[in-house]
Amino acid sequence: MALIEPFRALRYDPSRVSIPQVVTQPYDKITPEMQDRYYAASPHNLVRVILGKQQSSDHAGENTYTRASQFFRDWRRQGIFLQDTQPALYLYVQRFTAPGGTAELERRGIIALGRIEDYSAGVVFRHEQTLAKPKADRLELLRSTRAHFGQLFMLYSDPAGEIDGLLKPGCDPDMDLRDQYGVWQRVWKLSDPSVIELVRSKMRDKKLIIADGHHRYETALAYRNERQAAGAGQTASTPRERSSSSASGQPGAQGPAPHDLVMMTLVNMDGPGLVILPTHRVVHGLQSFSSAEFRAGASVYFSVEEVDSSVDAARATVILREAGRIGTALLAVTPDRVFLLDRPKPVDPSFFTGWSLRQQALDVVQLHNCLLEGVLGISEEAVREQKNVRYIRDIGEAMAQVRSGAANLAFLMNPARMAQVRDIALAGEVLPQKSTDFYPKLLTGLTIYALE
């Protein structure tokens, strides 16, 4: 049972700041160069809170987390943020053209508070593993600020589009901007109690899959457990108690405590605007590499066909798409040759120990087991720590790194299909690292959920 609640969001006051100058991409997509640009854009850019710069004088009493807390408190006191007076859901619409595409697409989501559930409850499902260090970082920020600044990207299934059909704002958006990638981002506040209750009712039988935000979800889960262990509020035990919080818009009155909830954007996985981009693998730092030896090794696992070595990014994309219609297909770009690898050959089942048949059907599992480890000898640990593998979204950049001599070879990929992600997640399984890249990302700072 997916339980969602409206809330009184904190939002930037557009009379005090320029919204495009203060919102950001998700914290884990912010490069050092982007961080510098965000700092320069506005003294109130949210990067100072979600990913502040470290200073050489930092110590336990003053550091990025204490500064984040101070910025957040100061901006609230100064009126940089305003809290909505009524509990609401927020319609979030993104219109965009995907990289490499031509069609304009639209993705609609609902910003709401969602009940934090243990994975064992069978309500929220993950599709990737998490790492301890990012979770420790986000937990320290949450403890310091007691607020959620970005939404978790959550997927639900609604083939008939019933929930999207309820979201008809009928007015100009509250927020309207284009981000640095040209994505048109708009937000409407939906405060009609009847619409809110209809959406909540329709969501109750849904299962939720985390698209982006696994580390933040597990951080919120850890924080909830901390607060409950400290006796800071008890979770409501019945649907009636849970729903009562929506009347006042203040979670914790009779329903879930504030720490039982986390901010989410809920997107229909069956909608036309859901895009997953491929993440290409660039291999570097090998002591020796030979195109001929690689081809011989790859031939043990795949049918190998050499293609024109001068192929460009556009043509490579077409080749991959066509070959991928019938199953696994990869392009291996070496300094002097390009190979199409498809039609995987039978291998000893022990080669995929620990992987289900669902997982084995993924191109990325075939790549990691057969090619990275089987042919090139790059261990799972080395892949996880990115010792010999870089992850690149742009296919042209991946090819250029090889042709410039900066890398040994690149593996160009097709994206994972949503059906694969869904089936693996609902089975309680996970995909390898960097298997999905949902596009576009959700902006951070459009709405903020303050726990106190």
Which residue stretches match the model-derived regions?
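Surface-exposed, charge/polar-rich loops and edge strands
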Residues: 1-452
